[in-house]
Amino acid sequence: MEQGNGERLAVIGAGLVGSLWALMLRKRGYEVDVYERRADPRTGPVLGGRSINLALSDRGWRGLEKAGVAEAVREIALPVLGRLMHGVDGATTFQRYGLPDAPGHFGDPQCIYSVSRARLNRILVEAAEREGARIHFGHACAAVEPDGPDGVRLRFERADGSAVDVGPLERVFGTDGAFSAVRDRMMRMDRFDFEQKYLGHGYRELAMQPDAAGGFRMREDALHIWPRGGYMLMALPNPDRTFTCTLFAPYDGPDGLDALADPAAAEAFFARAFPDVMQHFPDFQAEWMRHPTSSLVMVRCNPWHRSDRLCLMGDAAHAIVPFYGQGMNCGFEDCSVLSELLDREGSWSEAFAAYSAARKPAGDAILELALRNYIEMRDKTGDPRFLLQKRIEARLAARFSGEWLPLYSQVTFSHTPYHEALAAGRRQDAIMARVMDRPDIADVWDSNDVAEAAMALFRSPDFVG
């Protein structure tokens, strides 16, 4: 499709996905205005209720590479090589991400990267502005009128109470998050499906400061997890040698987030459930009270576009829970896929239709995968039988690397569509259920017999799980 042509496009939302997409559009020669309801993140505080740091992996890197900002982002990204599981007794178990000999990015081993949301957003906003995008902060989208004869018209409300009318525009992209104003307008159109649901669990963050010498208080190349059945604590390292710790727990019950609103109750709970953590918080109660409890919302909708005028991307199309570390990566993949479709298709309407068809099943799949991964991390990662299964799978991946690719690697270190990875993972689960049914599996798990039996099922076209 021919690029540019002087078309005026608007991006609603200057978060991570919106600023990346604005940058990509400018590189294609379009006139781009970005409207963001919040104040400029470079001058104002980060709003509460958003995770401080994020996990960046292959799907996200592809989008950053396409936009020409990967090198700048690598400077603020911290490699994370695997999970470090913490038992109640203080014992730890390290589980490596990826395949041992698989190459990663920038000469690093295969890993994920911890990045600051605020610093990444700043890089993307400034790159978009340098490329010529006009970014208007403090503009809350109040109305979207897509059906005018001359294009889309928008109305924005500013912090001072005044209103601004914009348009006509050729098309508008909704990258304005889980409570999208653009999607809200699409919901009033015919044959638009929408579902919103809150998880029964929420989260609360704490910042673990560096030690007295200015160093990390825990292993810095690992995602730390304290699995405790109905709840769990996670800690992700930051380049400034802090850790962002996040408690995921139900709202209800004696150890629920509602009960833990009392800082003394929260401190007693942490001392009981995560005793090895308490030494790293000299004033736990003060730190606990610095951060709000936040909810976890999930959004599904269909389609993700309307004719050639409106298109949803990122959380506006597919808000998911954070337990696979793929929310941002999925949003960046939206940008990559749509950019590739614009190269391939002959018109915006064809590109948008192909985008919805490709990304809707992927968005549904990564939501399911994230929910499954929460159960795995919370309930199973301390289970010896589950850990044995993972050791068998790792052995299969190492020995049959051209065939057996673990589900985590398919999701995190490949560009296999999420729904295809989910289907492959279900089949692998069925194979492993057969393998783990052997009464002597604990004694022969690393034998050739076990490996060959698993691969015989894997290679059989008749085995569908």
Feature-to-residue mapping (PLM):
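C-terminal helical "tail/cap" subdomain of flavin- and related membrane-associated enzymes
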Residues: 2-7, 340-465
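Conserved FAD-binding catalytic core of PHBH/FMO-like flavoproteins
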Residues: 126, 133, 139-143, 148-296, ...
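Hydrophobic "anchor" residues on beta-strands that sit immediately upstream
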Residues: 9, 32, 134, 166, ...
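Conserved mid-domain beta->alpha element of the FAD-binding
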Residues: 11-27, 173-174, 206, 292-382, ...
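Active-site-adjacent segment of FAD-dependent monooxygenases/related oxidoreductases
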Residues: 44-127
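Short phosphate-binding/catalytic loops that engage adenosine nucleotides
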Residues: 30, 69, 133
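Glycine-rich FAD pyrophosphate-binding loop
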Residues: 26-49
